[in-house]
């Protein structure tokens, strides 16, 4: 099940709308490379999310018969990763019979200069030594960390996709996918997307495939959910009910809770959501692999965190085989808090009761000294002194239980 924004992505520059200026600049730049006299070694392609930066680079490679060597700079952030791209580009010849290569470094503004030591320097070295044209993409090219990159590149800006081109695109998709979309709903999607074609198409797909039609009520409900973080119960429902990998991953990355706690929530509720034992096994298998990647990521290899998110969300969602059937419908289940949280809560309540008793004992002594020296003996003889200490019912119940254990 392919995502629609990939399925309907323009393959050629002539199909890319509303970017005439950027297309002309890129064509002149790539032709200067092919003529052996590049006017710049690298281009920094910038613009808001979803305007088609990566698409434009791919279309350029397609039209000029160039092999695209792509890397996400915010995922592969170490100096050796960047250098690896240069080595592959310079050492290995093309196996596709193309006339050359085009190197694409996506999301360079996602590099954290504190954590990803040497990444920017690695890119600068790559630009200096490259034998092939380089395109970098960024949402925010004015990030101070990119100052040196800006000085070494030709900057090409992209426009937001206008309302009319976006409307044509969405109507084309609705017609191809046989999806009924109300005009009011279409207008709402276009307005809320603010020129982000990927956002608009994902919303159209999420509602269209889930409900078979796109209405204003459904679109407004989905937009409201995107404006806030999801609570754990909403997150679970969106993961377990997801038919597409991107839907599950969006739910995981929009959760109010962190990844450690999310794994506990998912683990607790897999047997509740899935009735088939094989589905349960596949879900736990994906979750266990997510835990392994998460542990390794915490060890310093943070590139693996994205794999952990993929497995705990998309991997768990894909465990239910019935979803592949066209008439599949999600089952509503009542989820529960992780038993781990319940145990912590119960344990805290017990400790609080114990501490209140110790405070009553520790009139002429420190809390810790009373806990370690006096309290163990008090448990044996407490019935002789409970009236003096004015113990309440909860404290008496605790002492009765503690003295028997």
Swiss-Prot record:
Subunit structure comment from the entry: Heteromultimer composed of small subunits (RfcS) and large subunits (RfcL).
Protein role: Part of the RFC clamp loader complex which loads the PCNA sliding clamp onto DNA.
SUPFAM superfamilies xref list: P-loop containing nucleoside triphosphate hydrolases (SSF52540)
Family membership noted in the UniProt record: Belongs to the activator 1 small subunits family. RfcL subfamily.
PANTHER family in the record: CHROMOSOME TRANSMISSION FIDELITY FACTOR 18, REPLICATION FACTOR C SUBUNIT 1
Record InterPro entries: AAA+_ATPase, ATPase_AAA_core, P-loop_NTPase, Rep_factor-C_lsu, RFC_lid
Superkingdom per UniProt: Archaea
Residues that coordinate or bind ATP: 47-54
Gene: rfcL
Keyword annotations from UniProtKB, A to Z: ATP-binding, DNA replication, Nucleotide-binding
Gene3D superfamilies xref list: 1.10.8.60, P-loop containing nucleotide triphosphate hydrolases (3.40.50.300)
GO molecular function, a single term: ATP hydrolysis activity
Protein name according to UniProt: Replication factor C large subunit
One Gene Ontology term from the biological process aspect of the record: DNA replication
């Amino acid at each position: 099940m392919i995502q629609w924004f990939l399925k309907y992505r323009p393959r050629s520059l002539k199909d890319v709308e509303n970017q005439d200026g950027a297309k002309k600049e890129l064509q002149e730049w790539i032709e200067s490379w092919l003529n052996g006299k590049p006017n710049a070694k690298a281009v920094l392609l910038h613009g808001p999310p979803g305007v088609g930066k990566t698409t434009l680079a791919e279309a350029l490679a397609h039209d000029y018969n160039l092999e695209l060597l792509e890397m996400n700079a915010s995922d592969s952030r170490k100096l050796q990763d960047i250098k690896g791209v240069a080595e592959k580009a310079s050492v290995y010849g093309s196996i596709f019979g193309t006339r050359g290569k085009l190197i694409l470094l996506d999301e360079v503004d996602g590099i954290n200069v504190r954590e990803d030591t040497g990444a920017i320097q690695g890119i600068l070295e790559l630009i200096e030594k490259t034998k092939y044209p380089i395109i970098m993409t960024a949402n925010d090219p004015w990030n101070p960390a990119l100052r040196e990159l800006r000085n070494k590149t030709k900057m090409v800006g992209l426009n937001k996709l206008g309302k009319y081109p976006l409307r044509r695109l969405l109507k084309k998709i609705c017609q191809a996918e046989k999806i009924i979309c109300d005009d009011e709903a279409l207008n709402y999607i276009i307005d809320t997307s603010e020129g982000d074609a990927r956002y608009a198409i994902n919303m159209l797909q999420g509602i269209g495939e889930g409900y078979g039609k796109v209405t204003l009520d459904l679109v407004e409900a989905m937009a409201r959910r995107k404006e806030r973080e999801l609570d754990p119960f909403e997150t679970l429902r969106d993961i377990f009910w997801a038919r597409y990998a991107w839907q599950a991953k969006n739910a995981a990355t929009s959760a109010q809770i962190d990844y450690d706690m999310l794994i506990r929530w998912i683990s607790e509720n897999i047997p509740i959501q899935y009735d088939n034992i094989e589905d349960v096994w596949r879900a736990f298998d994906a979750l266990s692999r997510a835990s392994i990647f998460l542990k390794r990521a915490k060890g310093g290899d943070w590139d693996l965190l994205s794999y952990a998110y993929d497995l705990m969300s998309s991997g768990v969602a894909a465990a239910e085989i019935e979803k592949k059937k066209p008439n599949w419908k999600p089952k509503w289940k009542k989820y529960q808090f992780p038993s781990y949280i319940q145990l912590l809560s119960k344990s805290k309540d017990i400790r609080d009761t114990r501490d209140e008793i110790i405070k009553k004992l520790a009139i002429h002594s420190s809390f810790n000294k009373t806990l370690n020296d006096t309290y163990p003996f008090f448990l044996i003889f407490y019935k002789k002194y409970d009236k003096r200490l004015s113990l309440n019912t909860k404290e008496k119940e605790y002492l009765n239980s503690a003295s028997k254990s």
